[in-house]
Amino acid sequence: MLLVGSGAKFVQQLEQCGALAIFVTPEGGSEGHYLRRLRGAGYEVVTLSSKGIGDLASYLTSSHGVRPATLGKSQRRTYFYPSLIEQYRATLPPKAKGLVFWFYEGHVLSRQELSYLVKLSQEDKGVKFVVELGRERSIRWQPLQSA
């Protein structure tokens, strides 16, 4: 599939809105073009699956507990991890513009979680979000608050 355009409008609209909903083609592959454009623009991109995250607010902004699977008679343990935003912000290169969290399978997120991502991107200007909300014949995006 030939991609028309350089992806500059995508990066520009993400910088303007802070959070975008993206609809990609069913065969996939075209979103890699936009991932490369974001990296080329100076952003550190983190791709995550939306399935199995749990509480999105605690996962992104506060320390959260993770319980590994118990195999047999092993003890039940809970490991606590720092917030994902702080974890990746600590490893950012000095010249990076910020973080972009790219959520695929975003159709499983509720409206409340999507509005939280919009609010978080407005509060913290160094963090942006791209959420894949569905499939279309050609790739398109729109601000997440209007999706």
From Swiss-Prot:
It is found in: Cellular thylakoid membrane. It catalyses: a plastoquinone + NADH + (n+1) H(+)(in) = a plastoquinol + NAD(+) + n H(+)(out); a plastoquinone + NADPH + (n+1) H(+)(in) = a plastoquinol + NADP(+) + n H(+)(out). GO terms for cellular component: plasma membrane-derived thylakoid membrane. Its EC number is 7.1.1.-. It is an enzyme of class 7 (translocase). It comes from the Bacteria. The keyword Membrane applies. Keywords: Membrane, NAD, NADP, Plastoquinone, Quinone, Thylakoid, Translocase, Transport. InterPro entries: NAD(P)H-quinone_OxRdtase_su_N. Its main location: membrane. Belongs to the complex I NdhN subunit family. NDH-1 shuttles electrons from an unknown electron donor, via FMN and iron-sulfur (Fe-S) centers, to quinones in the respiratory and/or the photosynthetic chain. The immediate electron acceptor for the enzyme in this species is believed to be plastoquinone. Couples the redox reaction to proton translocation, and thus conserves the redox energy in a proton gradient. Cyanobacterial NDH-1 also plays a role in inorganic carbon-concentration. NDH-1 can be composed of about 15 different subunits; different subcomplexes with different compositions have been identified which probably have different functions. This is NAD(P)H-quinone oxidoreductase subunit N. It comes from Synechococcus sp. (strain JA-3-3Ab). The lineage of its organism: Bacteria, Bacillati, Cyanobacteriota, Cyanophyceae, Synechococcales.
